[in-house]
Amino acid sequence: MTVLDGRAPRSATTETQLSFRRPSGPRTVRNALATIYVTLATVLAVIPLVWVLFTVISKGARLVFTSTWWLQSQRGITPRREGGGAYHAIIGTLEIALICALIAVPLGVLGAIFLIEYARGTRAARAVSFTVDILSGIPSIVAALFIYALFITIFGFSRSAIAVSCALVLLMLPTVLRSTEEMLKLVPDSLREASYALGVSKWKTIMKVVIPTAFGGISTGVVLGLARVMGETAPLLILVSYAVGINFSPTSDTMGALPTMINSGRDQAPTLPGYERVWAAAFTLIIIVMLLNLLARGIARASKLKEK
């Protein structure tokens, strides 16, 4: 190519860009229709969520934004009587979730370490992955019935909050294991190899290099797993009785929790004060789950800033 009028020759890419034309009429119509369909699908998906949130907030916000709701229980409160709070149910929900996390998090993290660091590509890893896939799809009532049959019917243990936590472990474990597994896969092999080159053992490499690198993602998975199980109702209905007062003992057969508090007032007349407490309990559960999701986002953002 030669230079004309002191200007550089046009490349093939430039010629292609200059010859680019706007899409034809039919293509423009199809693009507009696709945009409309996608937008409509998004709106249809968001409308039920907004409707549910609006209904719960409008019917339960009055009680939730009072101090007595967070500081008092339902002991001595009848459906026709004003007052009382959800302190017992909030404490019970957090206690059950904490016990569940103490069991599910170590099992999930260690299971992911086994799959990625020790048994990658083996039959054992495929068997564990298949089992986890099955667990991730079982309904909560199946997990509750399994724990009831195993711990209460066969071993003779009593119904308790610990039994509820064990059932929730079966639901939380797949989330923790899968999220940890994905985070461990993202850790560059060069970090492991550099540690091995310095003479560090495999286990210390995992504890000092791999886990700290993936800690942000692992923590996010744990928090999301907790948010997933805190609203489950079937294990609570089957494995423990609802208590209207505060009970800190996880071995007791009665325990207050937000899902069972909601269930206990489902048959009350809409004009009774107890009916408003049901909506307030639902709003409280939404607030807790929302805070956990915000915590997960904060952990993920902090881990990204730390990497930079």
What are the functions of these language-model segments?
Residues 1-44, 296-308:
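Transmembrane alpha-helical segments of polytopic membrane transport and secretion proteins
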Residues 115, 181-185, 196, 223, ...:
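C-terminal transmembrane helix and the adjacent membrane-cytosol boundary/short C-terminal tail
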Residues 101, 179, 202-240:
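Transmembrane alpha-helices
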Residues 133-171:
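Generic hydrophobic transmembrane alpha-helix motif, especially the helices
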Residues 17-40, 54-100, 121, 264-276:
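Periplasmic/extracellular loop-to-transmembrane helix junction in inner-membrane transport proteins
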Residues 77-80, 236-287:
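Interhelical loop and adjacent transmembrane-helix boundary motif
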